[in-house]
Amino acid sequence: MSTPVILALTAGEPAGIGPELCLQLATGSRDAGLVVIASGELLRDRASQLGLQIELHDWQPGVAAATRAGHLSVRHVEGCGSTVAGRLDKANSQYVLDTLTIAARGCLNGDFDGMVTAPVHKGVINEAGIVFSGHTEFLQELCGVERVVMMLATEELRVALVTTHLPLKDVSAAITPDRLTQVTRILNADLKAFFGIDQPRILVAGLNPHAGEGGHLGREEIEVIEPTLEQLRAEGIQLTGPLPADTLFTPHWLDNADAVLAMYHDQGLPVLKFQGFGRAVNITLGLPIVRTSVDHGTALDLAGTGKADAGSLHTAIRVGEQMAQCRKATGAGELS
C-alpha cells in the first residue's frame, strides 16, 4: 500500500503557463496531496480568465491538502504584482524566488515530502538584477550541497548529465576525475534511495566520437573517463562504458540498463526529448529533498489561452510522488 505524501508545487513565472497548469490539475481529483506555492490573487485572476470554477483553500502546515476535483490548497505568497498573461514583469522576480524558497524550506523542515516546479523565466529574473542560473543551482545553494546532478526521465529512459549548461568548448576541461566521480556516486545512490533499484546498471557515454577511437579522436576517455570508471567499479558500482554515444542509445544497450550517464547536455537530451517530449520529467539528484520539474519552458505565447498541455506536469507530480513514497518506505536519504 502506497504511503500518502504531500508535495509543494511552485507555480513558476506568473506571466507564463505555470499558474494555469496548476489550476488545470485541480479540475480533476488527485492521489497526492498538492499545495500550490503562489499568490492566491494570481490564481483567482487566472482561473477567472480561463472560466475555471476552482475553490482555493488557504493551507498551513499540519493541514491536509485538498485532493477533490474543483478544490486546490494554496500557500499564499506575497509580492506578486498585477500580472498580464504572456507579458513578463521583472518586478515579480523576487516573488518567484520566494515561492522556491518557501517550498524548499518546507521540504527541509518536513512540511512537504517533495517539491515540483513549474517553469520560471531565467532571463527576466536576471534583468531584475538577481543572479539566477536556474532552479537546480538555486536549490543546490539553498540546501547547502556541494554537487547536484540533472537527470531527465521518461517511462522508458533516464539520462543524467556530467556537465549541464556549458558552452561545448568548455566541456572537455570540466570533465575531471573528481566531477565524474561525484556525479556517478550521486546517480548510483539516488537510483537506490528514490527509485528502489538495488543495484543500478549505468551506461556511460564517451565524450568523443566512437568514444575516442583508441585515442585517435581524443584522449579524454583514456586519460580521465576509463581510469575513473575503473575506480568506481571497485566501489561496487555497476558501470558499462565509456560507450560511443551513437550506439549507446539502442535497445541492445538500453534494454539492460537503468540509466544513462551522458557527458554533456546535447549528447544525452536530444534522444530523450525526441522520444518523450511533453512526457518527460526533470529530476534534481544530490539534494536532501525530492525535486522534480516539467521538461518545458514558460510558453508565454500560450499563457492565458487554456491551450497549455499539462502532460509533463502530471508526469513530474507522479514521479515526485513515487520518489517520496520510496524514500518513506525505505528510509533512505532521510534528513538527519
UniProtKB/Swiss-Prot annotation:
Main EC class of this protein?
oxidoreductase
Q: Supply the alphabetized keyword list.
A: Cobalt, Cytoplasm, Magnesium, Metal-binding, NAD, NADP, Oxidoreductase, Pyridoxine biosynthesis, Zinc
Reactions the enzyme catalyzes: 4-(phosphooxy)-L-threonine + NAD(+) = 3-amino-2-oxopropyl phosphate + CO2 + NADH
Q: Which residues bind substrate?
A: H135, T136, K273, N282, R291
Q: Name one GO biological process term.
A: pyridoxine biosynthetic process
Q: Which cofactors are required for activity?
A: Zn(2+); Mg(2+); Co(2+)
The protein's assembly and partners: Homodimer.
Q: Where does a divalent metal cation bind?
A: H165, H210, H265
What functional role does this protein have?
Answer: Catalyzes the NAD(P)-dependent oxidation of 4-(phosphooxy)-L-threonine (HTP) into 2-amino-3-oxo-4-(phosphooxy)butyric acid which spontaneously decarboxylates to form 3-amino-2-oxopropyl phosphate (AHAP).
Q: What is this protein called?
A: 4-hydroxythreonine-4-phosphate dehydrogenase
Q: In which pathway does it act?
A: Cofactor biosynthesis; pyridoxine 5'-phosphate biosynthesis; pyridoxine 5'-phosphate from D-erythrose 4-phosphate: step 4/5
Q: Which PANTHER family match?
A: 4-HYDROXYTHREONINE-4-PHOSPHATE DEHYDROGENASE (PTHR30004:SF5)
Q: Could you give the cofactor binding note from the entry?
A: Binds 1 divalent metal cation per subunit. Can use ions such as Zn(2+), Mg(2+) or Co(2+).
Highest taxon of source: Bacteria
EC numbers on record: 1.1.1.262
Annotated TM spans: none
Chief location bin: cytoplasm
One GO cellular component term, please give it.
cytoplasm
Q: Where in the cell is it found?
A: Cytoplasm
UniProt cross-references to HAMAP family, sorted A to Z = PdxA (MF_00536)
Q: Name one GO molecular function term.
A: 4-hydroxythreonine-4-phosphate dehydrogenase activity
Ranked from the top, the taxonomy reads:
Bacteria, Pseudomonadati, Pseudomonadota, Gammaproteobacteria, Pseudomonadales
InterPro entries, A to Z = PdxA, PdxA_fam
Family membership: Belongs to the PdxA family.
Reproduce the miscellaneous comment text.
Answer: The active site is located at the dimer interface.
